[in-house]
């Protein structure tokens, strides 16, 4: 462990992060929204923090180990959430609300404690969207592209930050080139989405803001009514398309764009599984909507949009779903537990893990029926080793245990079971909106619950193992 090297790297990254405040400063000047002092103070304070750290470690040679990689990833998201909370705190929010909002933004969860978005300054609204966009692909992956220029290796950090199978493969020979390719795709999707939003009726401000949170699968909006504010089928269709694109593995986008292999989508088993699961969830939701009586029966348009939004773990809405059949709302919440594809910007357990667990369970059942048979575990045409299956089951076990512990913590704080279950599920899976008391926002829950849920967001963003590893005594043993 090299603490001074870690501090030096943090200082560089915090200094880079401080430059992001230039954008809300420009927005504040354009709209004259009165929030300019907030972002000027934030820019100065965060920049000074980074510069002081750099000065104190100016002669340090960066030599990062595997252990350092884990610490950097975990601590950076914590430091980033704390520094990112400054504008919210200076705007009058409490400390816990500020950290909650910042953590929700940077982890692309989309849960909010703000109950009146339409009354906020434009610069603060834009800042929320910007947090999600930067967190979408992972600020660490962005930093990897510049780390080689600073003499810092990024390979271990890349494997720690990028979830699922994608972290084990290099799309290009060099980590830096991989990060740059992913960010070019990410930026390209954002630009196209923003242009399409604008051409279909959004203002320039709303188009840019919603393009960032759509492609980031974040779910933050500049309006209380979310995407429903625009009441436009074309905007909803665009939103659906880009939520899906961001829920697919970015490795597939890379092969389609850079290698001219669009058929990779059709032949990818995880892609097919995700689409099949989405369609099955949609079919069940439609059947519930048409055959289960409730105070309000949702339209087919509402069901389709909300199903895609929930399964991709985005969290956008086009109408109030609190009066929908509870079975439908619960179904869509469970859909978020499965989540998006590995190598995407979405949350949840991830489709490839679900595939491996289902196939492994099927293999064991077949072994019981045919004890002398030799049955290999396959995903598509590729064999999967038992060590991989064991790792996936280990992840799922820790996931369930973490969920139960977080749920008990929230229940102890006094929240009802429906609200507590959905809040933990929504935050652990980086979804955002829940059911019951947290269906609209998280403003009315107590400070302890907000702290627990902020931790759940971080746990989900780091795919559990990365965070829990550094909490074990063995990790810190020499």
Residue ranges and their predicted role:
Residues 1-478:
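Membrane-proximal intracellular helices of multi-pass ion channels
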């Amino acid at each position: 462990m090299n603490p001074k090297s870690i501090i030096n790297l943090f200082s560089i990254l915090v200094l880079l992060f401080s430059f992001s405040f230039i954008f809300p400063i420009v927005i504040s000047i354009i709209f004259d929204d009165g929030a300019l002092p907030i972002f000027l103070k934030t820019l100065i304070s965060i920049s000074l923090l980074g510069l002081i750290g750099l000065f104190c470690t100016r002669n340090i040679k960066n030599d990062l180990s595997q252990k350092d990689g884990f610490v950097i990833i975990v601590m950076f998201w914590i430091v980033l959430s704390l520094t990112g909370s400054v504008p919210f705190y200076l705007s009058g929010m409490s400390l816990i609300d500020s950290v909650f909002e910042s953590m929700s933004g940077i982890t692309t969860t989309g849960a909010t404690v703000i109950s009146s978005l339409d009354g906020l300054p434009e610069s603060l609204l834009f800042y929320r969207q910007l947090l999600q966009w930067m967190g979408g692909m992972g600020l660490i992956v962005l930093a990897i592209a510049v780390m080689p220029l600073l003499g810092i290796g990024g390979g271990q950090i890349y494997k720690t930050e990028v979830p699922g199978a994608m972290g084990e493969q290099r799309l290009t020979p060099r980590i830096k080139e991989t990060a740059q390719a992913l960010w070019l795709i990410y930026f390209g999707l954002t630009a196209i989405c923003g242009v399409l939003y604008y051409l279909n009726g959004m203002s320039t401000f709303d188009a840019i803001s919603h393009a960032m949170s759509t492609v980031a699968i974040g779910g933050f909006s500049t309006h209380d009514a979310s995407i429903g504010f625009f009441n436009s089928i074309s905007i909803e269709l665009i939103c659906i398309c880009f939520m899906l694109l961001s829920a697919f593995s970015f490795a597939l986008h890379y092969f389609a764009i850079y290698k001219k292999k669009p058929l990779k989508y059709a032949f990818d088993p995880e892609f097919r599984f995700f689409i099949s699961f989405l369609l099955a969830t949609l079919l069940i939701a439609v059947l519930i909507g048409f055959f289960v009586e409730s105070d309000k029966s949702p339209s087919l348009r509402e069901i389709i949009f909300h199903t895609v939004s929930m399964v991709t773990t985005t969290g956008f809405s086009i109408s109030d779903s609190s009066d929908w059949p509870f079975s439908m709302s619960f179904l869509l919440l469970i859909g978020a537990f499965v989540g998006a594809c590995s190598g995407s910007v979405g949350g949840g357990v991830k489709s490839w893990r679900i595939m491996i667990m289902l196939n492994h369970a099927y293999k064991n059942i077949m072994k019981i029926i045919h004890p002398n048979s030799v049955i290999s575990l396959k995903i598509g045409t590729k064999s999967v080793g038992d060590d991989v299956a064991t790792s996936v089951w280990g992840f799922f076990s820790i996931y369930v245990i973490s969920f139960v512990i977080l749920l008990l913590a929230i229940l102890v704080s006094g929240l009802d079971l429906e609200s507590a279950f959905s809040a933990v599920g929504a935050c652990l899976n980086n979804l955002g909106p829940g059911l019951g008391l947290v269906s609209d926002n998280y403003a009315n829950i107590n400070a302890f619950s907000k702290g627990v849920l902020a931790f759940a967001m971080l746990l989900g963003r780091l795919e559990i193992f990365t965070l829990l590893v550094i909490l074990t005594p063995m990790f810190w043993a020499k």
